[in-house]
Design a protein with these regions (language model features):
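Short, flexible beta-strand-to-coil junctions
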Residues: 11-13, 97-102, 153-154, 187-190
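Acidic glycine-/aspartate-rich tracts in secreted/extracellular proteins
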Residues: 13-14, 35-41, 82-86, 124, ...
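Extracellular glycan-recognition modules
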Residues: 58-118, 203-214
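Extracellular glycan-interaction patches encoded by glycine-rich segments
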Residues: 10-24, 178-203
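A general structural signal for short secondary-structure junctions and capping/turn motifs
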Residues: 21-25, 65-70, 175
Length: 218
């Protein structure tokens, strides 16, 4: 059996404040929560019983996706903070634009280098030049915010991280466009869940320039 307790401090501007109940006055405590996991998340309404949090991820598909997605050229901005320590293995996807086979365009913290990566995948393989790693950023550490922007069209791909760690590449063969049907936020659809907080996702139905990518992520 595991035993837990909650310690509550009442503090004012000058330090601790004492409080003694008198049978009528009191204090209200809201949102005290125990969680399994390596880091705390947001409040889970439990209504007096144990609750299990599902994976916090979103998918945009169907007409909701096709109404805004430009299959010829696109750009995406993502801002997020990971919580998993760099010494822990695992790929953490902040977003993925693709299909049910995970083909497409994904941005994640890579499990080996711990750097932010932009990965292009087609027919379950990586085309030549399909891994863009802005290694100048270094490890994406737990608690560190990364501002990542990518731009892509056939033959022209780029990624910028925090305003200057930029990599461009040319991927002219096996470019995944025709089968892209969804956008996942916080995973690549079948796993690689992003363990952290995503502050912003923005989509642009055009190819932004390198300077524009750097400005967005600065």
């Amino acid at each position: 059996q595991n035993a837990y307790y909650v310690h509550i401090d009442l503090e004012g501007g000058e330090g601790d404040v004492s409080f003694t109940g008198n049978g009528s006055n009191g204090m209200y405590v809201w949102g005290v929560q125990f969680e399994l996991g390596t880091f705390p998340t947001s409040y889970i309404p439990t209504n007096g019983a144990t609750a299990t949090r599902g994976n916090e991820l979103a998918v945009i598909d169907g007409e909701d996706f096709s109404d805004f997605y430009n299959s010829v050229e696109s750009s995406v901005l993502a801002v997020g903070t990971v919580q998993r320590p760099v010494e822990d293995q695992g790929q953490l996807n902040i977003f993925h634009i693709g299909d049910d086979n995970t083909d497409g365009h994904g941005v994640f913290r890579e499990h080996g280098t711990k750097d932010p990566w932009y990965h292009i995948r087609n027919n379950n393989s990586t085309p030549s030049g399909g891994n863009l790693n802005p290694s100048g950023f270094g490890d994406w550490d737990a608690g560190e915010e990364a501002r990542i922007a990518i731009a892509f069209k056939d033959g022209d791909q780029a990624i910028s991280v925090n305003g200057g760690n930029q990599v461009t590449a040319t991927v002219t063969s096996s470019y995944p466009t025709a089968n892209i049907t969804k956008m996942w936020i916080g995973s690549h659809g079948t796993g690689s869940y992003f363990e952290g907080h995503i502050k912003r996702i923005a989509y642009y139905p055009k190819l932004l320039t390198d300077n524009q990518l750097n400005t967005l992520t600065a």
